[in-house]
């Protein structure tokens, strides 16, 4: 079996491969977006359930397409979760040591950078996460977030400017 979904060939083996390949990455992404690791794990499970049900309609031909497709499902589910009345993102943060995106022995600089990224407004935090933690391109991010590529470039530039200013105030990275 290859690295991409085969339309019309949905199987448990395919689902297992996707979970093994993308599970940790999606959990890290959802954890950053939601600030709650347990809720993120629930969202990732729902992501794979939805992906499994929709495998026959997936038209990706490249492994990157599969990653972007799964990420789009997960990000949309996170957005839905944040829209719920009871969920207040600003009250939820997660320590860097719990992130799967970071090495277990994260350096002090990595911890400071993560903490600073967490202070960004959600729309900038999303693009930073997808670009630098998931290594997605601006066009892939645009597809995931259903926004124009130019908008993504603008948000990335603005987010980097904000990070630079905030890190300079902390005397970091100088």
Positions of PLM-derived features:
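N-terminal module of bacterial RNA polymerase sigma factors
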Residues: 1-25, 32, 56, 115, ...
């Amino acid at each position: 079996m290859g690295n991409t979904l085969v339309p019309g060939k949905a199987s448990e083996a395919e689902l297992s491969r996707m979970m093994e390949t993308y599970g940790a990455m999606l959990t890290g992404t959802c954890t950053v977006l939601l600030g709650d690791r347990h809720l993120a794990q629930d969202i990732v499970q729902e992501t794979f359930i939805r992906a499994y049900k929709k495998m026959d309609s997936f038209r990706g031909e490249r492994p990157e397409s599969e990653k972007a497709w799964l990420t789009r499902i997960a990000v949309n589910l996170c957005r839905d979760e944040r829209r719920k009345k009871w969920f207040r993102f600003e009250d939820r943060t997660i320590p860097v040591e719990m992130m799967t995106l970071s090495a277990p022995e994260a350096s002090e600089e990595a911890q400071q950078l993560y903490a600073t990224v967490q202070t960004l407004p959600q729309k900038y935090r999303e693009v930073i996460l997808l670009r630098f933690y998931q290594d997605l391109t601006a066009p892939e991010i645009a597809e995931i977030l259903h926004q124009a590529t130019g908008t993504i470039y603008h948000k990335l530039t603005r987010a980097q400017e904000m990070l630079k200013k905030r890190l300079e105030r902390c005397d970091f990275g100088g």
